[in-house]
Amino acid sequence: MDNQPKIKTSAALRFIFVTIFIDVMGLAIIIPVIPKLLEQLGDVNISVASEINGWLTATYAIMQILFSPVMGNLSDRFGRRPILLISLIGFCIDYTFMAFAPSVFWLFVGRTIAGITGATMSTATAYIADISTGDKRAANFGIVGAASGLGFIIGVSGGAFLGGIDIKFPFMVAAAAALFNALYGYFVLPESLDKTHRRKFEWKRANPVGSFIQLGKYRALLGLAIAFTLVYIAQKAVEYQLPFYVYEKFQWSMISVGCLGLFIGFMLICIQGWLIRYLIPKWGLQKNIIIGLVSYGVGLLLIAFSSYGWQMYLYMIPYCFGGISGPALQGYITSKFEANEQGELQGGLTLLSSISLVVGPLVMGYSFKFFTHKDSAVYFPGAPYILGALLILISILIVIRSLKKDINPAR
């Protein structure tokens, strides 16, 4: 009888691993082909395609800003399970639009739908918070990184291979994966939020302003929120500009991008799925956050000034090691919130991430276009990575100051 909660927790974590794996795989599978798809549908060069990609991502993020607080609060009211399933169906519709879109316009339609319903990651992290206690919470958040890494490996490599067959084939596979996961969740996923821990749905808390107000109850958290919004923006230099960067600077093929994706995913699995479980007890949450951010910044600077394609593998090592900061931050923040506030918290953090998705890809896309356009006075495709490193530096200064304070409710 004593082992029952452990068995349930283990089974739930396995499902969340699969959910995040398929979700990230669906996102990663399109990475090698999205530059070529935009060039083809929009009849533009890669510099302009990078700009379009920024707007495409921003459209998704704006919908997330408007609707993620609603989805987070709904998960606190009705449970995590139904929200996860709705999100997966939304992604299935989005990828279907991408697979059969006759023009760029329909890509925007699909991204809008996915942005409205997309709460997979925030609900999954709230789910983990529901079933985790004490020191295991931060370690369990490492599952998110491990699943993301494996999904990234399979997604990017599979996308590179499938894109060589047909440029729209990866989107069909992504749609099928999202649908499969929704069906899998419908029959297998248990609810994690007990009815006694649920609360009434409140519109004043289910909007962007309401989420900021709730986050504002925690003085030091505001500083961390600002800092990690800057980190999210900096990460977009790698997440959304990397294919454009290596296509432009090194004239890589889709297969080459896929191979780099394999390496990045392998690193994420090793660091966030295994190494972090030793580093958190050894260094503590705060030290992991700082060391991770410094490593992020170093990696971005090295990538910016890379001269040969093989160096991308070497310089991705410090960048990927920076991933230890994410689970540490999640564990640090979630420990300050009650069980019936976890959905709202994750909705608020997703809101901040979505703000970075509006600003990051647009800023990084414009900087890439500005320094690679044929009329540019200075040719430097690494500009987005320099900008990202500067944002990391600012975030480190803010985090150091914020962590000196205790996060206590300002009530």
Locate each region found by the language model.
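Cytoplasmic helix-loop-helix junction between adjacent transmembrane helices
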Residues: V109-G149
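A membrane-interface helix-boundary motif in multi-pass transporters
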Residues: G163-A176, Y366-I392
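Juxtamembrane intracellular "pre-TM" segments in multi-pass secondary transporters
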Residues: D2-S10, P190-A227, E248-K249
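Conserved MFS/SLC helix-loop-helix module at the cytosolic interface between two early adjacent transmembrane helices
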Residues: I65-V104
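Helix-breaking motifs and short loop linkers at transmembrane-helix boundaries and internal kinks
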Residues: G79, F100-F105, T117, S132, ...
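Short amphipathic helix-loop junctions that connect adjacent transmembrane helices
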Residues: V33-S50, Y240-V257
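C-terminal transmembrane helical hairpin of 12-TM major facilitator-type secondary transporters
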Residues: Q286-L329
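Helix-to-loop junctions at the C-terminal end of transmembrane segments
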Residues: L66-G79, I271-L285, F368
